[in-house]
Curated annotation (Swiss-Prot):
Keywords: Chaperone, Cytoplasm, Ribosome biogenesis, rRNA processing. It comes from the Bacteria. Gene3D superfamilies: PRC-barrel domain, RimM. One of its GO terms (cellular component) is cytoplasm. It is found in: Cytoplasm. It comes from Xanthomonas campestris pv. campestris (strain 8004). An accessory protein needed during the final step in the assembly of 30S ribosomal subunit, possibly for assembly of the head region. Essential for efficient processing of 16S rRNA. May be needed both before and after RbfA during the maturation of 16S rRNA. It has affinity for free ribosomal 30S subunits but not for 70S ribosomes. GO terms for molecular function: ribosome binding. Binds ribosomal protein uS19. The keyword Transmembrane helix does not apply. This is Ribosome maturation factor RimM.
């Protein structure tokens, strides 16, 4: 990975599993087990120490996602990794399908209405279960359902712009 390449946070280590060095993970990929498809991992401990891992294997285990890191075979080492964040280079992710977007690619884009009223910048997104919501910060914070084409009319990465059909007073 190039030092300037953008990293994507995919999950974190939340604990140990068993006594053989297996780890419990929290994954933000969809489905959660997809985290194992994207490698190598850049792992960053809570103290800021980073390392690169390849060949990580894993599985679903009931409510948990279990990982096996190469060369880690004891529980004590795993316990010390609690809270470690798991990143990959943005280039490790496949291109999104048409009309699908990675949230991280939308963050920082400008948002304006179909009438040209500037609303602000995408701060972040979250899921409600039924749809995603884009949080736009400008003169105030707005939460706009990320629903194509009803509210989101276009996403233009070249222009750094999302156009929405949204009342600026709402």
């Amino acid at each position: 990975m190039k030092p300037t390449e953008r990293r994507i946070l995919l999950g974190r280590i939340v604990g140990a599993f068993g006594v053989k060095g297996e780890l419990k993970l929290e994954s933000w990929t969809e489905p959660r087990s997809a985290i194992f498809r994207y490698q190598p991992w850049i792992v960053r401990t809570p103290s800021g120490q980073e390392s690169v891992l390849s060949g990580v294997r894993g599985r679903d285990q009931g409510k948990n996602l279990i990982a096996v890191f190469p060369d880690i075979t004891d529980r004590d080492t795993v316990e010390a990794m609690h809270g470690t964040e798991i990143y990959v280079a943005r280039s490790a992710l496949p291109p999104p399908k048409p009309d699908e977007y990675y949230w991280v690619d939308l963050e920082g884009l400008q948002v304006e209405t179909v009438e040209g009223v500037k609303l602000g910048t995408v701060s972040h997104l979250f899921s409600t279960g039924s749809n995603d919501v884009v949080v736009v910060r400008g003169d105030r914070e707005r939460m706009i359902p990320f629903v194509l084409p009803e509210y989101v009319k276009s996403v233009d990465f070249e222009a750094n712009l999302i156009v929405v059909d949204w009342d600026p007073d709402f």
